[in-house]
Structure formats: C-alpha cells, structure tokens
Amino acid sequence: MQLKKTLIATVLVLAMGSSWAQADPARAQKIVMGSCFLCHGENGESSSEVFPKLAGQHANYIAKQLENFKTGQRKSTAMADMSSRLSPDEMLALGKYFEAKPSAPEPVEDANLAAVGSYIFHTGNTYSGVPACASCHGKEALGSANLPRLAGQYPEYIENQLKLFNQRERTNDNAVMHAIVSKMTPLEMAAVAAYVSGK
C-alpha cells in the first residue's frame, strides 16, 4: 500500500514538473517584452484602464482567455492577432509569468460607492435576485484557478466587462455572467467595480 502511494506521488510530481517545463519562463519573458508590455506593462500593471491588469491573475484563466481570443470565442482585433502566434504552452507560460507578479489595489475614490459595492459583492440583492459575487469569486475577490481575480483590477475595466456581459458583446463565459449582470443596475455595477478594485 505504501509503495502504491509513493508511486502515485512520484507520478504527480513528475506531471507537475512537466507542466512547469512546458511553461517556459524565459520564453514568456521574451514574449512579454516583445509585445505584451506595450499594453499590459512588463509586470502586468497596465498604465491604462483600457487594458486589464494581469499581475496576480490566475495562470489558467489567462491561458483560457488567450485561447478564446485565438479561436474568436472572445472578441478583440488586437488580441486575436497577438494570440494567433501563441502555442498552448506559451499561453500557459504567459499565465504563470503574470500570476507570479504582485498586484497592488487601486485607490478608492468614492468610499460610499465602494460600501454599496461591498454589500452587493458579499450579500447580493435578494430583491432583484442578484447573487453574492463572493460565492464564485471568493470573499477577497481573488477568484480561483478558473475564475478571475477581481481584486485590484481597474474599476473602469470591471464595469465595462459587466456591461459587455449584459449586452452579450462578451461572448465567452457569457451564460452565467449574463444571467447575473442582467439583474444588476448600472449603480450596482459601478459599486461592485469600485469595491473590488480597492482590495
């Protein structure tokens, strides 16, 4: 029995090592400095709210978004072009590169708005049927391997993505998010964005 457990553990370690080997950090650095940094910054802290911060974002989530851009499941002319040159291993390598970078919270400009956002994020709105965002994205808005980290993201970017989900203009991951966001008011969207950006 002990030998069987040891063999299983060894296989898992080797598999993890293989995954990390495929996600070549040197290759990721080269790709970042060749193109990604122009919009997202060398360390994933983009200088404009038009472009999402990638620092601290989950590797699997980044890789999935790149794949969705490449296949056209998520629309963006610029990102479709960039991702068309990437292999799955390179996408994962970029994900791991940015996931390892520290992320800083955005300053809260409207404390009252953020307080409303905190309530919606943690409790939802029972009257309109909006569920608590924390039920999927976590109490600290850190997400999970397959769900995005929202903490520290630009509020303008988050608010815009919520609107795109509502209008079905963002077509990947749309079913669940559209069902939720379609019940939110513009104020609630802005409030949630203000709250999570400051975390």
Question: Which residues fall in each region the model found?
Answer:
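Periodic glycine anchor positions in long extracellular repeat architectures
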Residues: 41-44, 56, 138, 152
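Stable alpha-helical elements in mature extracytoplasmic
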Residues: 32, 58, 65, 75-78, ...
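The canonical Cys-X-X-Cys-His
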Residues: 36-42, 94, 130-139, 192
